[in-house]
Amino acid sequence: MGVTKKPDLNDPVLRAKLAKGMGHNYYGEPAWPNDLLYIFPVVILGTIACNVGLAILEPSMLGEPADPFATPLEILPEWYFFPVFQILRTVPNKLLGVLLMVSVPSGLLTVPFLENVNKFQNPFRRPVATTVFLIGTVVALWLGIGATLPIDKSLTLGLF
């Protein structure tokens, strides 16, 4: 059983802290050993038991066996590679495509330095960084959606 510290309400320091709403450290149950030795292992073992139980009751299906001689008509990367895949697919020159791919992380590295003299954290008070972020997000979404379309409709997204 843990040792609890009983608050002395006649103490002027405690009364001042309670008046400010800072007296929560003077009463209650200590974290050691009650929480760390008894409650946390129960929560961790319960989480592991739930995961194992779900894995046993609902195993993931493997799907159909792989056929190395049957390739899909159009091979697409994972969804988070769609914008880069679209850049490589639409740019005719390989060197220019690689340079554009390198410009993505280098452009992201320059965003914090656009308004580093600005002391505000509110995005509405940092218009240049916010505009660069919004334009980058729109371009990434445009490239990502375009990568899922055929090559003749990919740049206009089939709208024009």
From Swiss-Prot:
Signal peptide, first to last residue: none
Keywords: Chloroplast, Electron transport, Membrane, Photosynthesis, Plastid, Thylakoid, Transmembrane, Transmembrane helix, Transport
Keyword Ribonucleoprotein recorded: no
Record's bilayer topology term: Multi-pass membrane protein
Name of a matching Pfam family: Cytochrom_B_C
Cellular component aspect of the GO annotation: chloroplast thylakoid membrane
Family matches, as InterPro entries: Cyt_b/b6_C, Cyt_b/b6_C_sf, Cyt_b6/f_cplx_suIV, Cytochrome_b_C_euk/bac
Protein name as catalogued: Cytochrome b6-f complex subunit 4
Compartment list: Plastid, Chloroplast thylakoid membrane
GO MF assignments: electron transporter, transferring electrons within cytochrome b6/f complex of photosystem II activity; electron transporter, transferring electrons within the cyclic electron transport pathway of photosynthesis activity; oxidoreductase activity
Subunit structure: The 4 large subunits of the cytochrome b6-f complex are cytochrome b6, subunit IV (17 kDa polypeptide, petD), cytochrome f and the Rieske protein, while the 4 small subunits are petG, petL, petM and petN. The complex functions as a dimer.
A biological-process GO annotation: photosynthetic electron transport chain
Gene (UniProt): petD
Function summary: Component of the cytochrome b6-f complex, which mediates electron transfer between photosystem II (PSII) and photosystem I (PSI), cyclic electron flow around PSI, and state transitions.
Membrane-spanning intervals of the chain: 36-56, 95-115, 131-151
Similarity comment: Belongs to the cytochrome b family. PetD subfamily.
SS bonds (residue pairs): none
